[in-house]
């Protein structure tokens, strides 16, 4: 940090009086300072996080979301949770008490095509992105495979998607062997249900009622 220019201002919530800080009288362009708090929180949050709410009724597993982002995630799998859910033949997904907009405050709508702006959803799955891999035998593998993907050798982008539709177009000639591309898909409850069924390889029922008297499954991080 000795070669960096840093400015930090610390003050009480709802009060404009600064308590302390470093270089806070220097004019600077604000950056993503919340990342500092994110790192601090992750270092002090322990070794598990709540991943799903669940309730077992006879041979049926009832689940609801906590917002956990790593179900079927392309980079960070959760084998213990996935094995637990797959051990049931009957699964019911309960509507979670989560109210989200697809984009956060100040998110740019035209960044919808970038992996770092995957849509927010009540139950993220696959990281809310598709993974496109050009394998060394020149075949193209798309995960998950429930969306329509069309080759278009005329387009200038490697991957293109209509803004509000899950119609994907790829130009294989621009994708090198071994390349991996992550591209956000449009989320919805129907898409979530379809992806859950595809990943867990079983039919999943939907229940509008919130899940009550549930337990919490904690996943290791």
Please place each PLM-identified region on the residue numbering:
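Glycine-/proline-rich flexible loop or hinge segments
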Residues: 18-27, 61-63, 180
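Short active-site loop at a secondary-structure junction
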Residues: 21-41, 45
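Conserved serine DD-peptidase/penicillin-binding transpeptidase domain
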Residues: 44-221
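A common structural microfeature
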Residues: 5-7, 33, 60
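Residue-level preference for non-acidic, small/hydrophobic
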Residues: 16, 35-42, 91, 123
């Amino acid at each position: 940090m000795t070669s960096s220019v840093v400015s930090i201002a610390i003050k009480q919530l709802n009060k404009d009086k600064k308590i302390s800080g470093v270089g806070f009288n220097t004019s600077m362009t604000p950056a993503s300072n919340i990342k500092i708090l994110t790192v601090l929180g992750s270092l002090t949050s322990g070794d598990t996080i709540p991943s799903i709410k669940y309730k077992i009724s006879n041979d049926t597993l009832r689940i609801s979301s906590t917002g956990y982002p790593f179900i079927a995630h392309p980079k960070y799998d959760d084998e213990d949770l996935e094995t637990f859910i797959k051990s049931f033949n009957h699964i019911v997904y309960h509507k979670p008490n989560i109210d989200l907009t697809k984009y956060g405050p100040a998110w740019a709508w035209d960044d919808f095509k970038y992996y770092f702006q995957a849509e927010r959803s009540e139950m993220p799955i696959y990281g809310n992105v598709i993974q496109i891999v050009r394998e060394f035998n020149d075949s193209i593998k798309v995960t998950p495979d429930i969306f329509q993907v069309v080759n278009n050798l005329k387009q200038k982008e490697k991957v293109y998607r209509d803004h509000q539709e899950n119609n994907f177009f790829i130009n294989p000639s621009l994708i090198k062997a071994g390349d991996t591309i992550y591209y956000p898909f449009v989320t919805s409850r129907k898409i979530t249900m379809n992806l859950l069924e595809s990943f867990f390889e079983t039919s999943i029922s939907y229940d509008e009622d919130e899940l009550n008297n549930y337990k919490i499954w904690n996943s290791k991080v």
